[in-house]
Amino acid sequence: MDPLNATGMDAFTAIHLNASWSADSGYSLAAIASIAALVSFLILFTVVGNILVVIAVLTSRALKAPQNLFLVSLATADILVATLVMPFSLANELMGYWYFGKVWCGIYLALDVLFCTSSIVHLCAISLDRYWSVTQAVEYNLKRTPKRVKCIIVIVWLISAFISSPPLLSIDSNNYISSQPQCMLNDDTWYILSSSMASFFAPCLIMILVYIRIYQVAKTRTRSMSGKEPRPDGVTQTENGLNKANSPCHGDRENGHCQCPPTPSQRTVTIGQQTDDADMDESFSSEGKGHKPQRQDSQRAKRPGLKKSSISKQSARISRVSNKSVDLFASRRKRRRSSIAEKKVSQAREKRFTFVLAVVMGVFVVCWFPFFFSYSLHAVCRDYCKIPDTLFKFFWIGYCNSSLNPAIYTIFNRDFRRAFQKILCKSWKKSF
């Protein structure tokens, strides 16, 4: 009888079954209790952390970018690992045999391969998305709509399902001959090598090569931008953002001042002056341009009131035109500065996102490489090299990876950190 159905049995029988269970698994009762507690905490942490990731992306404005849907799908895969794979792996590990039947064994193995493959294919798709966003920034950002990202996610899951389908057809039936059946993948060399290559090594190689290329492109752009930043000696920037060296003074100097080409606002004022002069029958002249005939002076002397009112009207018109020009120039400069600031914020966010994903990919490779390496080594030299059975426990390190992504987002990304704090504070306030 299974220990799980020990309800109503006397204490002696329960202790006896626990002792036999301990003997089958090779663990002591204390070790079984410790492992069960540790893995249970890992499952809970994985589920809660990845649910927070999903809620954060779907509710936070700072995380509304379409590419973050990849993280939602990746978090979903990690949640499914924690709920549909890890509990049965824990039971199989502690009991020492597979209790749940042959049919569920095939489904369990297929789901295990599916979610592992899905995680790395997601990371591969994310690396390609990063590469295209870096090399084809304008064109690709216009194409990268939520609908397009969702289509890519569906393709990722279909590829993962295709790779993970063989376990349903290739379960080793010899594992069920003994009284204590084992749930293991097909042990044939061809299957081990092909599944390892398709599920891990090939996507991992693509991912690493793409990120190396992203690093090279980013480094080249940084060098080119740093080469453009230095200004020539003697060049200063005026308040309106124009370089003095780019607007040289020319012509003769008058009264110690240099005659420079008029700025747009100055041109507008000049036009207003010309219009007013025409309205006043050219009664005014610029300073230093000579004198009009004496007859005009006598006419102006006869009309002092007209002269004062005309001067005030002209000054008002010039002031209005000048103010409009200054306001227009200031608004354009403000819009230009705001667009530049938005662009810098967007670029900084893209850089942070790329760095975080690089950390996620690196941690994934570190967690899963030991298992796939030992698994493939067993297929290649099973007759010549003895691999300890403990090496096949490395898949637990791979399972731990499912719980690490939320922690990585929290540590390395400010937007995720703020979103998590907001979600937790809201739930904390609602609970009181």
From Swiss-Prot:
Residues 222-319 are annotated as: Disordered. InterPro entries: ADR_fam (IPR002233), ADRA2C_rcpt (IPR000735), GPCR_Rhodpsn (IPR000276), GPCR_Rhodpsn_7TM (IPR017452). GO terms for molecular function: alpha2-adrenergic receptor activity; epinephrine binding. PANTHER family: ADRENERGIC RECEPTOR-RELATED G-PROTEIN COUPLED RECEPTOR (PTHR24248), ALPHA-2C ADRENERGIC RECEPTOR (PTHR24248:SF25). GO terms for cellular component: plasma membrane. Its main location: membrane. It holds the Pfam family 7tm_1. This is Alpha-2 adrenergic receptor. Residues 288-300 have a biased composition (Basic and acidic residues). Belongs to the G-protein coupled receptor 1 family. It is a multi-pass membrane protein. Glycans are attached at N5, N18. Disulfide bonds join C105-C183. GO terms for biological process: platelet activation; regulation of smooth muscle contraction; regulation of vasoconstriction. Residues 1-32, 96-105, 173-188, 381-393 are extracellular.
